[in-house]
Amino acid sequence: KVAVLTHWGADNIRYAGISMGKGEGFTLHNLKMNYTDRCGVCKDIAGTLIAFLRMAGFEAFPAMTMAGSRVETIPADHFNHCVAVVKLSDGTMMPLDPTWVPFCRELWSSAEQQQNYLPGTPEGTDLCLTPISDPENHYVRIKAQNTLDEKGTLKGTFTIEAEGQSDSNIRRIFTTGFQSEWAHTMERQLLNVSPKARLKSVDYGRTPKDYQRAPIQITFRYEIPEYALKGDQGEMVFKPFVLNNLYTQVLSY
């Protein structure tokens, strides 16, 4: 339920920084206004989620954080972003950020790990710290099956799979880009490997925009003439395909 409600708020309440006049500050608006307008800033998106969670029977509260920065342990206004927390059955507080997870398979953006936040509970709470997200939550896997002929032409297929922040990065062309650019974007990945690459086909499923269904998976079929060069003794010289400028935007090295 928590995941469903978080993603509904993330995907259906549009971020729009419209001035509401003086004195707004951190004031949370009521659900009727947020649900009717279907837009607002972070506090409106978080406020919608908090109201939904409470209606679903959860204890949920607003929380403040400083996106991208540390919050000092002194009484001062160090906050620039409103998020939400929900109390789990074991009593722990789970941070949720619907503003930063549209089209993302997370509930809190792991681009903001080890970040301070201050829950607004009735009894009061000290500064908290968001947990580290293990690399396994953001894997990228590329499996290729290729053959080289005597002329150095590479033919084959590769499949890329990804999760978490890596999924969001690779899937972005489908969730925020124009559909007319999908095939061109896929082809550009191969052209990064070689300007002679030819994309034969690409399979990204029927609904690549549906990020909640499963981790992203794309299969390419291609041909690259003169991928390998012949040495003086007839040997083939080439760089391993999956290490040759393929999806470099999600590599961490």
Report each predicted region and the residues it spans.
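A sensor for short, sequence-defined functional sites
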Residues: 1-253
